Curated annotation (Swiss-Prot):
Gene3D superfamilies: Tobacco mosaic virus-like, coat protein. Belongs to the virgaviridae capsid protein family. The lineage of its organism: Viruses, Riboviria, Orthornavirae, Kitrinoviricota, Alsuviricetes. Pfam families: TMV_coat. Its main location: virion. The modification N-acetylalanine is found at A2. InterPro entries: TMV-like_coat (IPR001337), TMV-like_coat_sf (IPR036417). Signal peptide: none annotated. It comes from Sunn-hemp mosaic virus. Capsid protein self-assembles to form rod-shaped virions about 18 nm in diameter with a central canal enclosing the viral genomic RNA. This is Capsid protein. GO terms for cellular component: helical viral capsid.
Amino acid sequence: MAYSIPTPSQLVYFTENYADYIPFVNRLINARSNSFQTQSGRDELREILIKSQVSVVSPISRFPAEPAYYIYLRDPSISTVYTALLQSTDTRNRVIEVENSTNVTTAEQLNAVRRTDDASTAIHNNLEQLLSLLTNGTGVFNRTSFESASGLTWLVTTTPRTA
């Protein structure tokens, strides 16, 4: 048994572009209470997001049966917000950019605080947008909706009977 031979545009469905719906949404909900003022806080969220990405289907492994629900992270609406969320956590070496690191000016310190606040605000905004999309079912697949949206057909092979 296998999926029909995919076209190149269907190969993306076999990659680590999924997240298990309930654990992922729970992680997003829990993350909303963080301030993300430290790089370690932003790194922790980024790591949680990246470790949530899984592959649930392959050419020879069918999408899990109901009641399994997975978020397709390459869905155009989800991907835009998810990518923005990942980018907003990546502020390492950009929070403090100074000419002379041994003599940081007050203006440079204030700029670093603003960048940290901007990153934290962006993370919170992206978390809320992503939760809103997921609550509305955007990019959420079960087996039936996955096979319909992807155009992949599960082929059941039968073995010929011998007399």
